[in-house]
Each structure stands twice: as C-alpha cells, then as structure tokens.
Amino acid sequence: MYYGFDIGGTKIALGVFDSGRQLQWEKRVPTPRDSYDAFLDAVCELVAEADQRFGCKGSVGIGIPGMPETEDGTLYAANVPAASGKPLRADLSARLDRDVRLDNDANCFALSEAWDDEFTQYPLVMGLILGTGVGGGLIFNGKPITGKSYITGEFGHMRLPVDALTMMGLDFPLRRCGCGQHGCIENYLSGRGFAWLYQHYYHQPLQAPEIIALYDQGDEQARAHVERYLDLLAVCLGNILTIVDPDLVVIGGGLSNFPAITTQLADRLPRHLLPVARVPRIERARHGDAGGMRGAAFLHLTD
C-alpha cells in the first residue's frame, strides 16, 4: 500500500492507495503548530493506524509547502512552523523504519494529475494552481522536476511581463509580494488577486465567489472583469509556455472551479506564443482535495 500525506498549516491528511492507485482510506488530524515532537507523533500515529488497518508496512510520501529539504537536510516551510528548520525526512525515516519521501505540495498536485489514466499519454505535464496563491509543478515522463532548490514551478513569483503592463496601463501598481519582491503575478492571478483586481478597477470589495456569481448572472461589470483577468492570465501563461512548452496544462486551486478559466483561456494564448508554437491541452484538475495525498503517495512509484 502507498501512504500519501498532504500536510499544511492546519491539517495533516493521510490517504492510503492500493497498487491500482485507488484511494482505500483517509484520515485527517490537526497540524500541531508549536511542538516538533507532537508533529512527528501525529504523522507516526497515522502511519501506525494505517499499517494495522491494512496489515502491511506501507510506503510513505509527504507533500508539504515550501522547500522539503534544504542543503543542510532541513525543511523550510513557513506555514508549518513546528517542523520548519528540522530534518523532517531523516527523522521520520528513522522513526518509521522506512524510506520517507518528501516533495513540495504543488509538485505532488502535478504528479497526481500526470498519473491520471487519461493524462498519462502526455510526456510533459504542467500543473498550475490558481488558489490562495499561484504555484505549480512540472512532471516529465511521470517524474517531478524539482530543481536544485525545489522551486521549479514557483510560477507565482515571476514578475508581470511588459505586455501585461501595456495592457493594464503603465501606471498599474506593482504590489509588494510576501516574498519581498514587487509585481509577482501571484498578487494578481490568485483568488485574492482576482478580487483585488475587481476592487482596483471598480472600487467594490467583493470576494472571488461573489464576483463569479455576478458573472453567472450576466452582470456586465463582472463580465468585463473576467475578460480582463483572462487576458492577464494569458499574457503571463504565454511567457511560461514559451519556456516550458508542455503537452498538457492542468489547472487546480479554487479558481479552477470557475469554468471560464479552462474553457476560454486557450483561444487567448496564440497571440502570446511564437508562431510555430502549439497551444497545449488545458484541463481542470481531476482529483480535487485528494490530489495532494495522491501525488505524495506516488512519489514511491517514480523510480
């Protein structure tokens, strides 16, 4: 059996998958915030419960935000303070007496989608998350591309391209990002960015679901806003596609539930690509909340 953990700031979620990559059992517990020992105990207790339930010693893969393993072997994960700065992989491998594999949670999302039965035909899969932030991952021939610093796929921290500023106006504000830079596309293309753009142009503080509801009702202002957002997304994604040239782009995160994102994006891309470039297939993520656990479990299938 393959155990996949999706660990975030508030929850530790475990999914157990069989050899057919089907979910057999899952359980969630709160993430301890202050005690590293309590954090390790929470993970180990879930593994012990799964081992007992299924009568085997399952493999363990973990998806977690941040850098799973820095040069000194420690985890960097600001959203998981109890474990950040600790040698998490080594400690869990020792306590569980098995090889524990860690990767960035966005890479696990992309891996889950790349291993979907419908998508395994595509050699190069790009996962794009449009949620609280903007991120993603790259999967080549069924294996995640992590890079030296585990930051492959940190698309949200690319800066707005010149074409975007031309389209939005040269006086468009370059917002300061949590990473310390200015103009990162995450500040405009995430769910919060979607809402910020609306407030910037229309001076109304609405959340993304409220704007989308207005769009569905035919509200002209909301429709104009969505058109602007999609144009901005196409400009930014065009730059990424010129570098990566994937066969498939799978979009996840809260905004992926808005059909216009996946149905109206492809037609906007050619003007931002080289004339010989082919627009990749663009699809909504198939596995929802289980995607992180699923991809983490499959880290042991990538050898």
Swiss-Prot record:
ATP binds at residues 4-11, 133-140. Keywords: ATP-binding, Carbohydrate metabolism, Kinase, Metal-binding, Nucleotide-binding, Transferase, Zinc. InterPro entries: ATPase_NBD, N-acetyl-D-glucosamine_kinase, ROK, ROK_cs. Active from pH 6.5 to 10. Zn(2+) binds at H157, C177, C179, C184. Belongs to the ROK (NagC/XylR) family. NagK subfamily. This is N-acetyl-D-glucosamine kinase. It comes from Escherichia coli (strain K12). The gene is nagK.
